[in-house]
Amino acid sequence: TEEKPFPCSECGKRFARRQHLTDHQSSHTGEKPYACSQCEKYFPHRSNLNRHLKLHKGEKPFPCSQCGKRFPCVSDLNIHRRVHTGERPYSCSECGKCFKHHSNLTNHQRTHTREKPFSCTECGKGFKDRSSLTVHHRTHTGEKPFSCTECGKGFKDRSSLTVHHRTH
């Protein structure tokens, strides 16, 4: 077995490489320093961002045997299978609500703690997740990166564009 001289001070898990420890520690802090330049998503590790970028490139070599939907990596396919099985392995210790994704549980738990760890540098308003902060920040910058293909009107987030599309 490989020697693992780098322990996590938070949970004790040990790693063979310092970089692996550094990557792991973001699971405790919730830090997501790697941003996708094409959309409003952030990731805790460069490998997560690289996997996500495959979506923008259209690389999806792993098909679901039940519905045919394709995925950029096996782990995404395995998570997708929960749609068919109904599995929700992450449960809230406060209220018992269950989630398919750990990140959804983490964001949900902030509704109980009222924690808002992401603050706007312009006005100080706090948010429970980074993507909400990103969208809010556009109210200050005026950025509207989502445009309607029918009329050209711009929107600060994808959901507003989706609602707008229904008017055409």
Swiss-Prot record:
Keyword DNA-binding among record annotations: yes
Zinc fingers classed as C2H2-type: ranges: 6-28, 34-56, 62-84, 90-112, 118-140, 146-168
Source organism (scientific name): Xenopus laevis (African clawed frog)
Main location: nucleus
Protein name stated in the entry: Oocyte zinc finger protein XlCOF19
Alphabetized UniProt keyword annotations: DNA-binding, Metal-binding, Nucleus, Repeat, Transcription, Transcription regulation, Zinc, Zinc-finger
Assigned protein family: Belongs to the krueppel C2H2-type zinc-finger protein family.
GO molecular function: DNA-binding transcription factor activity, RNA polymerase II-specific; RNA polymerase II cis-regulatory region sequence-specific DNA binding; zinc ion binding
Function of the protein: May be involved in transcriptional regulation.
CC terms in the record's Gene Ontology section: nucleus
Places the protein is found: Nucleus
InterPro entries xref list: Znf_C2H2_sf (IPR036236), Znf_C2H2_type (IPR013087)
